[in-house]
């Protein structure tokens, strides 16, 4: 909404500052953080009161979790999504369609995760929405968003898969790109969901990825920078940096309460939404493959589950002591802080590797 203050810049030149995406990104970040810091304790108290026993803890998981995490409320994603939404609505350009598409995916996935969390908490079981139903809803949301992105963008770029490290190399998938894009968005959402298993483990890599894609969005949406770096220019996507800023701020606020020992868990409400947001931004700015690099930690977690399930069904043997892979390291004797901080370090290194694709061509 503050974007409209630009109209008053002829009378008040200071309002020209609202033209700059960088300024509004910083404003969205501060707004998201302040919102979560201010309302976080109230949200946590209400969730704890309404949930009673909190998130059910897996009895087949690490036994230490039964002692240290029992009774902790979930659905903390509500804090993040609230701060993210307020920051975005306050600072982003309301006429930019990319903002609304990505925000719709984020909140849509958040609703799916919220209902899943609600089912688990009320029934005190790990069985929330059935897998098929959940995937059907996710693919419907993601498919609609990707259709809009292809229709909105410039052909043939909008329907093409861009290959990093090479100049102007891309595969035009036509309308089949909608299906591919939907897989990227749904895959990202569920990969982040699988990563969210330890205090602070998911939110920091999500923020690292958001910062990276905030930069990529800004550069891809700026014709001068895009030409200099020889990346594909996607008009209008620079505004997505504001969403990334809002996520960074809300994520920092959430980490304050999610730092070990966590006062609240993100839950599917947050992990599905944030993963879906990263996936939809990657599709919008044509950096889907780069997402697999920057979000390599999420890919590793998801692949570990796929490998574990496939191996057990085919051979009756498990590759890992437990999946996702962060539980494997727990079973090997790593402490929770060791796993979390080491995974953060990996996330930083992967982000730097992904950002290197902007220049190495």
UniProtKB/Swiss-Prot annotation:
InterPro entries listed in its UniProt record: Glycosyl_transferase_4, PNAcMuramoyl-5peptid_Trfase, PNAcMuramoyl-5peptid_Trfase_CS
Group of enzyme by EC: transferase
Gene this protein is translated from: mraY
GO annotation (BP), single: cell wall organization
Alphabetical keyword list: Cell cycle, Cell division, Cell inner membrane, Cell membrane, Cell shape, Cell wall biogenesis/degradation, Magnesium, Membrane, Metal-binding, Peptidoglycan synthesis, Transferase, Transmembrane, Transmembrane helix
Entry's family note: Belongs to the glycosyltransferase 4 family. MraY subfamily.
Function of the molecule: Catalyzes the initial step of the lipid cycle reactions in the biosynthesis of the cell wall peptidoglycan: transfers peptidoglycan precursor phospho-MurNAc-pentapeptide from UDP-MurNAc-pentapeptide onto the lipid carrier undecaprenyl phosphate, yielding undecaprenyl-pyrophosphoryl-MurNAc-pentapeptide, known as lipid I.
PROSITE patterns in the record: MRAY_1, MRAY_2
Name under which the protein is recorded: Phospho-N-acetylmuramoyl-pentapeptide-transferase
GO cellular component: plasma membrane
Membrane topology: Multi-pass membrane protein
């Amino acid at each position: 909404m503050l974007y409209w203050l630009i109209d008053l810049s002829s009378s008040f030149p200071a309002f020209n500052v609202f033209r700059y995406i960088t300024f509004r990104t910083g404003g969205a970040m501060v707004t998201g953080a302040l919102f979560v810091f201010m309302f976080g304790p109230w949200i946590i108290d209400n969730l704890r009161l309404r949930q009673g026993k909190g998130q059910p803890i897996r009895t087949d998981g690490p036994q230490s979790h039964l002692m240290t995490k029992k009774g902790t409320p979930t659905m903390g994603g509500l804090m993040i999504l609230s701060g993210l939404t307020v920051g975005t609505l306050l600072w982003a350009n309301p006429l930019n369609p990319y903002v609304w598409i990505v925000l719709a995916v984020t909140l849509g996935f958040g609703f799916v995760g919220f209902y899943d969390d609600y089912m688990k908490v009320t029934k005190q079981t790990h069985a929330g929405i059935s897998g098929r139903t959940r995937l059907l809803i996710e693919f419907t949301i993601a498919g609609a968003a990707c259709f809009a992105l292809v229709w909105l963008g410039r052909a043939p770029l909008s329907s093409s898969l861009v290959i990093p490290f090479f100049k102007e190399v891309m595969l035009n998938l036509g309308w089949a790109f909608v299906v591919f894009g939907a897989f990227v968005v749904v895959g990202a959402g569920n990969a982040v969901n699988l990563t969210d298993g330890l205090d602070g483990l998911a939110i920091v890599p999500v923020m690292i990825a958001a910062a990276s894609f905030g930069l990529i969005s800004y550069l891809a949406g700026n014709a001068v920078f895009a030409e200099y770096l020889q990346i594909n220019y996607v008009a209008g996507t620079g505004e997505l940096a504001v969403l990334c800023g809002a996520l960074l701020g809300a994520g920092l606020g959430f980490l304050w309460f999610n730092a070990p020992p966590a006062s609240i868990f993100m839950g599917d409400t947050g992990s599905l939404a944030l993963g879906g947001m990263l996936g939809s931004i990657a599709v919008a700015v044509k950096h889907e493959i780069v997402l697999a690099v920057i979000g390599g930690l999420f890919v590793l977690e998801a692949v570990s589950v796929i490998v574990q399930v496939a191996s057990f069904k085919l051979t009756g043997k498990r590759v890992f002591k437990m999946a996702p892979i962060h539980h494997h390291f727990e079973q090997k004797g790593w402490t929770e802080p060791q796993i979390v901080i080491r995974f953060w370090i990996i996330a930083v290194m992967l982000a730097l590797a992904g950002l290197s694709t902007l220049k190495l061509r």
